[in-house]
Amino acid sequence: MDPELLELLLALDGVAQAPRYHPEGDALYHSLQVFDIARRDTDDPELWAAALFHDVGKACPDDEATHDEVGADLLEGLVPERVVWLVRHHLDLLREPARARRRHRACPWLPDLERLRRWDLAARSPTALTTTPAAAWALLQERNDPRHR
């Protein structure tokens, strides 16, 4: 995995989020919670990566685009296409769930998007103990090592 991914993750440290939607705190803490929930729910390292990097666009605000679009653009070429797609669409089921399900019904990744949405919504604890960024990175590195596939 490209070391640039770790930099994108660490850039979330201290990125404030609206307390109404994110009582847990900054974007890094939230992303680590989503990652931990994903790890408990699946052995799929691509879904772990989508969980960990779903909000990386929040560290690079853009007046023209939303954080899901910015994040997907940042991840393009660094992670598999499936991860980019999940990051790009991770808010679709929040914004317009029925429309998103219709639009993506033929996509084989829709069930993964549903899971990512659930994990994202569940990761709101201000007291959760999380994996450290370095440990999350190491787990992804290990799972993406061809010897572990």
Residue ranges of model-derived segments:
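Alpha-helix initiation and N-capping motif
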Residues: 2-6, 46, 80, 109-110, ...
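Divalent metal-dependent catalytic cores for phosphoryl transfer on phosphate-bearing substrates
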Residues: 37-125
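Generic structural signal of hydrophobic/aromatic residues within well-ordered alpha-helices
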Residues: 5-12, 103, 112-113, 136, ...
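Acidic/His-rich, divalent-metal-binding segments that scaffold phosphate/diphosphate chemistry
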Residues: 1-63
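Short secondary-structure junctions and interdomain/linker hinges
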Residues: 12, 16-19, 41, 45, ...
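Charged substrate- and nucleic-acid-binding regions of tRNA-handling and nucleotidyl-transfer enzymes
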Residues: 110-149
